[in-house]
């Protein structure tokens, strides 16, 4: 299948990592953006009020500063303090919108200690705005643990919706969007990775996967081995930025494209459902138990994992499958 490559050369790029501006004529400068948001009506009916003792999950741009909502700006301005995955990166965002609220660090490596400190401040009546580097806190980013702590203490949590790379990619993918599963980043540990790839090979729903440029080629090759070269995939790169690119192809085409070019930027992969994949496990009734187990072993599962998978497919216990194998 030939690749359908769609490049967006008119997306306004205001990359926060590049001082929140660009020299391109289509970019949104921090100054112009500040002028725009100063005129935004953030509501006076009380629905947008920032309340004490509340955690706010503030969605931030995934590449284009203009995607930051007026409600998000209001919360960042009025919260007592801001918890940030990376205080330097969030600091650049805050500078662009003229916000000078105090910040504290909350990330994957300090979330236990920092989380308890944030909880104490929330219980004392302060309001906190949680920001990650990009997108919605808790979605493949720090935040879920803090929300769980709040839930356990009866602390209100409010999400301020906004940009999300997974949903943005899904929307432009051309795949079935009625049912989908978010995988995030695939495991790096070999056994877990092979098990996840085997699951994807029989997944009927559209699957959304995050990948970094230095692992993209390996992941595409492994997906092709697991799902078959004819399985459709949409690759989304640099979403919402000036060099946004959407490639609609199949896994054979994707591997071919990236054999001739080096990946650049962060990727969202949208893998189409199991009806496009090389083998349908719904055909198990036509094969023997041994053949069924061999299928999963060929997909990278260990003997025991394969037996568990076959037992699940056939609705019987692992013991029955094991006895059938040793007959």
Annotated model-derived regions:
Residues 84-85, 141, 210:
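Short beta-strand scaffold positions
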Residues 145-203:
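Class I SAM-dependent methyltransferase SAM-binding "motif I" and its flanking Rossmann-like core
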Residues 142-146, 303:
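Glycine-centered tight-turn and secondary-structure capping sites
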Residues 110-118:
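Glycine-rich, highly charged phosphate/nucleotide-binding loops
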Residues 54-55, 126-128, 206:
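Loop/turn-to-beta-strand initiation segments
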């Amino acid at each position: 299948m030939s690749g359908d490559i769609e490049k967006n050369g008119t997306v306004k790029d205001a990359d926060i990592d590049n001082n929140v501006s660009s020299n391109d004529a289509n970019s949104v400068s921090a100054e112009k953006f500040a002028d725009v948001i100063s005129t935004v009506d953030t509501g006076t009916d009380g629905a947008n009020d920032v309340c004490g003792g509340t955690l706010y999950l503030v969605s931030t741009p995934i590449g284009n500063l203009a995607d930051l909502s007026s409600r998000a700006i209001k919360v960042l301005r009025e919260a007592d303090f801001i918890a940030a995955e990376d205080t330097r990166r969030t600091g650049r965002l805050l500078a662009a919108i003229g916000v000078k609220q105090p910040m504290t660090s909350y990330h994957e490596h300090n979330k236990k200690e920092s989380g308890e400190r944030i909880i104490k401040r929330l219980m004392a009546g302060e309001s906190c705005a949680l920001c990650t580097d990009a997108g919605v806190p808790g979605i493949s980013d720090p935040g879920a643990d803090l929300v769980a702590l709040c839930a356990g203490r009866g602390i209100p949590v409010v999400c301020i919706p906004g940009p999300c790379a997974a949903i943005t990619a899904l929307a432009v993918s051309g795949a079935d969007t009625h049912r989908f599963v978010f995988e995030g980043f695939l495991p790096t540990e070999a056994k877990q990775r092979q098990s996840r790839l085997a699951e994807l090979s029989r997944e009927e729903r559209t699957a959304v996967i995050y990948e970094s440029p230095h692992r993209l080629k390996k992941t595409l090759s492994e997906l092709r081995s697991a799902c078959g070269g004819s399985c459709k995939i949409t690759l989304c790169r640099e979403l919402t930025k000036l060099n946004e690119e959407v490639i609609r192809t199949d896994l054979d085409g994707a591997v071919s494209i990236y054999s001739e070019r080096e990946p650049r930027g962060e990727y969202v992969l949208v893998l189409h459902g199991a009806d496009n994949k090389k083998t349908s496990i719904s055909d198990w009734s036509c094969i023997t138990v041994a053949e069924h187990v061999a299928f999963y072993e060929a997909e990278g599962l260990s003997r025991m994992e394969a037996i568990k998978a076959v037992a699940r497919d056939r609705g019987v216990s692992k013991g029955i499958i094991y006895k059938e194998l040793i007959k």
